[in-house]
A protein has these predicted regions:
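A charged, well-structured terminal subsegment
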Residues: 119, 181-205
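Short, well-ordered beta-strand core segments
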Residues: 127, 153, 170-173
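Short beta->alpha connector loops at strand-helix junctions that form conserved
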Residues: 94, 131, 157, 172-180
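A short, well-structured juxtamembrane/interface segment
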Residues: 33-54
């Protein structure tokens, strides 16, 4: 697969890029049952469900496409995914432009998530830290702040070991060659996690 993740064009036809990319996407999706594996996703989902059942909340953070994923998954919890049920407490730390720019201006971009975790996070809450590299400084600082406040950390990561693994109670790795494929895996895992949480809380477990 090429560095762009679309394969080499055959005969200059743009359609060949799609023909290469879609099978690669399907391979990543099919690999998730092995890595990170069903048991690991269930462990992460249990942390989220326990936090919500105890009156806590789930905070999400990430950069770029991972910021969009953070907002997507927070919306699934506040809204609904599969079941009609009460709203769950979930916040994406990527959405308040006034907070992001104020903290970025006063403390630096590396603190834009950690400062929010410090203000909003409580013991028993969960931070879902999303990073394809596992090396984004602002995500690492958010995870460190969360652990210092007695929160659990779930990390959605790419294929390689990273510093974020060390801060996470559960690290969920996706074996994708490029960021876009990893992010697709993150959303698939996120949907599975949110659906599991809904089922568990609906059953009162």
């Amino acid at each position: 697969m090429s560095p762009e993740g679309f394969g080499e064009p055959q005969g200059g036809a743009p359609m060949s890029q799609i023909a290469n990319y879609l099978p690669d996407s399907a391979k990543v999706a099919a690999s998730l049952a092995e890595r990170p594996g069903v048991a690991a996703v269930e462990r992460a989902a249990a942390l989220v469900a326990d936090a919500l059942a105890g009156g806590g909340q789930v905070l999400f953070c990430g950069n770029g496409g991972s910021a969009a994923d953070a907002q997507h998954l927070a919306a699934e919890l506040v809204g609904r995914l599969l079941l009609e049920r009460p709203a769950y407490r979930a916040v994406a730390l990527t959405t308040d432009t006034s907070v992001l720019t104020a903290v970025g201006n006063d403390y630096g971009y590396a603190e834009v998530f950690a400062r929010q975790v410090e203000g909003l996070g409580r013991p028993g809450d969960v931070l879902v830290a999303i990073s394809t590299s596992g090396r984004s400084e602002n995500v690492l600082r958010a995870a460190a702040t969360a652990r210092a406040r007695g929160m659990a950390v779930v990390a959605l990561l790419g294929p390689a070991a990273s510093p974020l693994d060390e801060a996470a109670e559960v690290a969920l790795h996706v074996d994708g060659d490029v960021a876009g494929l990893v992010q697709q895996g993150h959303i698939t895992i996120g949907h599975a996690l949110c659906g599991w949480v809904e089922q568990r809380l609906a059953a009162g477990r």
